[in-house]
UniProtKB/Swiss-Prot annotation:
Protein name (database record): Protein RecA
Gene: recA
Database matches in InterPro entries: AAA+_ATPase, DNA_recomb/repair_RecA, DNA_recomb/repair_RecA_CS, P-loop_NTPase, RecA-like_C, RecA-like_N, RecA_ATP-bd, RecA_C_sf
Protein function: Can catalyze the hydrolysis of ATP in the presence of single-stranded DNA, the ATP-dependent uptake of single-stranded DNA by duplex DNA, and the ATP-dependent hybridization of homologous single-stranded DNAs. It interacts with LexA causing its activation and leading to its autocatalytic cleavage.
Residues the entry annotates as binding ATP: 66-73
Keywords: ATP-binding, Cytoplasm, DNA damage, DNA recombination, DNA repair, DNA-binding, Nucleotide-binding, SOS response
Cellular component terms (Gene Ontology): cytosol
Matches recorded under Pfam families: RecA, RecA_C
Record's keyword annotation contains Isomerase: no
Location in the cell: Cytoplasm
Length: 347
């Protein structure tokens, strides 16, 4: 760059900073602009790896969608539990009025510390979200769900009234307001969404999500969660096998998948994932039905190996960190593991 251009650019930058404040424009190499992405673990080792950065990125909008009973709320409650283990504050905007507090506690959520709101209208839900984000004191907000964000005009109208595009306009306006503040306050905002079918689609995928297209554009990460099978113990169904596909990812390559078990009353089976991923990474050895680690047998069959890791959390954490290192994903902080152990002991 010539001296004249350099001088003109410096004058323009000085004018912008004077008008809009320090930090309104900066070079990418100045440090602040090139900070590493801070993440919150999903509670699933496989999903953390599939996301490429070790979890869900803070200061971003995330959308989780899927069919009914696929594990959407369970996954978000696991993320809240992981955040709370690190001392973070979370809020749950329960627009569906369906949060099971006892189930949340079973998943490891510190319920007394969780902020909860059950708004009457979509506008109220998004105003509360905006106020919480602007406070700068909240680390994570979950909105459950976009489909339940009913505009005030629809609630006050008659049952058969047709109000096309009202919810989409509401979401579009809210996201325009929220996105900048979310980035500035480093708050993770998760929108849970439902699936609908497009009528008359002959080719391609007939599925779509509610609330218009704005959320698809503003989301940095979109996760498609599906139940793909049942987990049985003898003849009793004890959980679901779940697949999550990273449909959109602005912080890492997209279209990766994670498959994990969700056990009823327990949530994501972290021990089961450690065993499966440990075998794939050749950190855990499998010979027939026996699993072994560092030459020592840890169980015959997956259920026994899972139980061994549950009883020996320090070995589970050691295997997990070795898996993360082998795949170049951030290691789990010791604090999170210690708090998880303390919670297991209390139970």
């Amino acid at each position: 760059m010539t001296a004249e251009k350099s001088k003109a650019l410096a004058a323009a930058l000085a004018q912008i900073e004077k008008q809009f404040g320090k930090g309104s424009i900066m070079r990418m190499g100045d440090g602040e602009a090139a900070e590493d992405i801070q993440v919150v673990s999903t509670g699933s080792l496989g999903l953390d790896i599939a996301l490429g950065v070790g979890g869900l990125p803070r200061g971003r909008v995330v959308e989780i969608y899927g069919p009914e009973s696929s594990g959407k709320t369970t996954l978000t409650l696991q993320v809240i539990a992981e955040l709370q283990k690190l001392g973070g504050t979370a809020a749950f905007i329960d627009a569906e009025h369906a949060l099971d507090v006892q189930y949340a506690a079973k998943l490891g959520v510190n319920v007394p510390e969780l902020l909860i709101s059950q708004p009457d209208t979509g506008e109220q839900a998004l105003e509360i979200t905006d106020a919480l984000v602007r406070s700068g004191s909240i680390d994570m907000i979950v909105i459950d769900s976009v489909a339940a964000l009913v505009p005030k005009a629809e609630i006050e109208g008659e049952m058969g009234d047709s109000l096309p595009g009202l919810q989409a306009r509401l979401m579009s306006q809210a996201l325009r307001k929220l996105t900048g503040t979310i980035k500035r306050t480093n708050c993770l905002v998760i929108f849970i969404n439902q699936i609908r079918m497009k009528i008359g689609v002959m080719f391609g995928n007939p599925e779509t999500t509610t609330g218009g297209n704005a959320l698809k554009f503003y989301s940095s990460v979109r996760l498609d969660i599906r139940r793909i099978g049942s987990i049985k113990k003898n003849d009793e169904v004890i959980g679901n096998e779940t697949r999550v596909k990273v449909v959109k990812n602005k912080v890492s390559p997209p279209f990766r998948e994670a498959i994990f078990d969700i056990l009823y009353g327990e949530g994501i089976s972290r021990q089961g994932e450690i065993i499966d991923l440990g075998v794939q990474a050749k950190i855990v050895d499998k010979a027939g039905a026996w699993y072994s680690y560092n030459g020592e047998k840890i169980g015959q069959g997956k259920d026994n190996a899972r139980e061994f890791l549950r009883e020996n959390p320090e070995i589970a954490r050691e295997i997990e960190n070795r898996i993360r290192e082998s795949l170049g994903v951030v290691a789990m902080p010791d604090g999170a593991g210690n708090e998880a152990e303390a919670m297991d002991e209390e139970e």
